[in-house]
A protein has these predicted regions:
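Short, surface-exposed, charged amphipathic helix/loop patches that serve as local interaction elements
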Residues: 1-110
Length: 110
């Protein structure tokens, strides 16, 4: 039996980059303890605890369309529906009792 550590997803709307390209398909990996602990040291999280979601997702989303490495600026640029979709996926694959305050939007399905 093997442990699945990466999960594919398709964003409902998709991220539009600076050239106007749409990126919808991606991959998310299971979170590690470091993914939830290290962002707590980030000054952006200290001044705005809600920013934890942005940092954590930028660490665990390993691919989004043809983009290179994902960073917090890309996560900030997601449509709200897409952010909620990723939060829901994060909670589903990592269990409901994770430490990161990644919340789902009610009523959104995957």
């Amino acid at each position: 039996m093997t442990l699945q550590t990466e999960y594919e997803f398709t964003l409902p709307k998709g991220y539009i980059d600076s050239q106007g390209n749409l990126h919808r398909d991606g991959r998310m990996r299971l979170a590690t303890a470091a993914d939830e602990i290290l962002p707590l040291r980030d000054p952006r999280v200290k001044s705005n605890p809600a920013y934890l979601t942005v940092i954590v997702l930028s660490r665990v989303v390993t691919q989004l369309g043809g983009l290179g490495e994902l960073n917090p600026n890309i996560v900030e640029g997601l449509f709200v529906e897409d952010l909620a979709h990723l939060q829901q996926l994060y909670r589903r694959i990592n269990g409901e009792d994770g430490q990161a305050e990644v919340q789902t939007a009610s009523g959104l399905g995957e």
